[in-house]
Amino acid sequence: MLYYVLVFLVVALVAGALGFGGIAGASAGIAQILFFFFLALLVISLIASAIRKA
């Protein structure tokens, strides 16, 4: 489960860098959507991991 958390974090950071940094140009909106989507998946994975350990 921690593996997925790290994968989602990396993908969210990359999508955020592309979306907010202006590198993506025309697809900045898509990058922002992906950023928040994977950020939500990261939070869900962290919560699920914490619940399983408890």
Swiss-Prot record:
InterPro entries, alphabetized: DUF1328
Transmembrane segments annotated in the record for this chain: 5-25, 29-48
UniProt KW keywords: Cell membrane, Membrane, Transmembrane, Transmembrane helix
GO annotations of cellular component type: plasma membrane
Localization, UniProt: Cell membrane
Predominant cellular place of this UniProt entry's protein: membrane
Stored Pfam families: DUF1328 (PF07043)
Topological type in the membrane: Multi-pass membrane protein
Family: Belongs to the UPF0391 family.
NCBIfam families per UniProt: PRK13682.1-3 (NF010228)
Protein name (record): UPF0391 membrane protein BMEI0373
Species this chain originates from: Brucella melitensis biotype 1 (strain ATCC 23456 / CCUG 17765 / NCTC 10094 / 16M)
Lineage of the organism: Bacteria, Pseudomonadati, Pseudomonadota, Alphaproteobacteria, Hyphomicrobiales
